[in-house]
Amino acid sequence: MSITKEQILDAVAEMSVMDVVELISMMEEKFGVSAAAAVAVAAGGPAEAAEEKTEFDVVLSAIGANKVAVIKAVRGATGLGLKEAKDLVESAPATLKEGVSKDDAETLKKDLEQAGASVEVK
């Protein structure tokens, strides 16, 4: 009996964020590919280059001295469970959120820095 695409999708939907990240890295190794999105460069004018960025990624660079406070802040910001938040914090540098607005990214950065973490907004 073969597994359907729907069953695979349901199984992935039930995984934690850390499990999905691990699955992606295993797939990258097995198939020799990268999950990074391919960027096509279009021959556009300078107006396109001047466009302001609207989506930002929040990256935890370093934990700092107060690891417990950082884990609490990550849990609050991401909705992860305690173990997943701890694993994510300990794997720094790690991307916490992707594609968030500038205001949300700056708020998250401020909260995490108050907890003692080093954070970058890209």
Swiss-Prot record:
TM stretches of this protein: none
Pfam families per the UniProt record, alphabetical: Ribosomal_L12, Ribosomal_L12_N
Domain of life of the source: Bacteria
Swiss-Prot/TrEMBL GO biological process terms: translation
Keyword Ribosomal protein listed: yes
GO CC, alphabetical: cytosolic large ribosomal subunit
One Gene Ontology molecular-function label: mRNA binding
Keyword Metal-binding in record: no
Record key words, sorted: Ribonucleoprotein, Ribosomal protein
InterPro entries xrefs: Ribosomal_bL12, Ribosomal_bL12_C, Ribosomal_bL12_C/ClpS-like, Ribosomal_bL12_oligo, Ribosomal_bL12_oligo_N_sf
Assembly behavior: Homodimer. Part of the ribosomal stalk of the 50S ribosomal subunit. Forms a multimeric L10(L12)X complex, where L10 forms an elongated spine to which 2 to 4 L12 dimers bind in a sequential fashion. Binds GTP-bound translation factors.
Family affiliation: Belongs to the bacterial ribosomal protein bL12 family.
NCBIfam families, sorted: L12 (TIGR00855)
Its job: Forms part of the ribosomal stalk which helps the ribosome interact with GTP-bound translation factors. Is thus essential for accurate translation.
Entry protein name: Large ribosomal subunit protein bL12
